Amino acid sequence: MPELRTDRLVLRRWRESDLEPWAAMNADPEVREHLGELLTREQSDAAVALMQAEFDERGFGWWALEARETGEFIGRAGLDDVDEDMPFAGADAGVDIGWRLTRTAWGHGYATEAAMACLAYGFDVLGLPEVVATTTVNNLRSQAVMRRIGMTRDPADDFEDPSVPEGPLRRCVLYRSPRREHRRKSS
């Protein structure tokens, strides 16, 4: 797993010391507002083991986020395979980009900074043709990050997430960033 560095962040391999703050994030109703149920410590630990194994297997996945100035764990960001049951899945669906930060890390631009590093890795290192991002229609903070990193949304692509039960979290938006757009914006 390569380590990525930005001006203020380190995107790195998960450590044992990340497990407690990661579990606290997953037990925080505000952090999980647009994600559904809260996770137990055991579920959070299992998620880290799975994320690490998938990254090692595929060459991409979820990095732990660390604030460079303090060394503090502040969340995760990365790239993931698009689930096969998503309505937009297919040969050209690319991968999904995402982020999740501790509440204390909100509002500082960390999600945008981490996402830009993940996009660059996806396009420049992995050679991905496209990166997508999804969130609930009500998650305006994440949608703002998607726009700030240059992704675009066509409302015709909005969808019902088949993995989510009926309710306010089921309706989702889809943002896209084709490789050619990334090249144009980074030139």
Please describe what each predicted stretch is.
Residues 1-20, 24-34, 49, 66-187:
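Acyl-donor (CoA/ACP) binding surface of acyl/acetyltransferases
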Residues 30-51, 60-63:
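Conserved GNAT-fold acetyl-CoA-binding loop/helix
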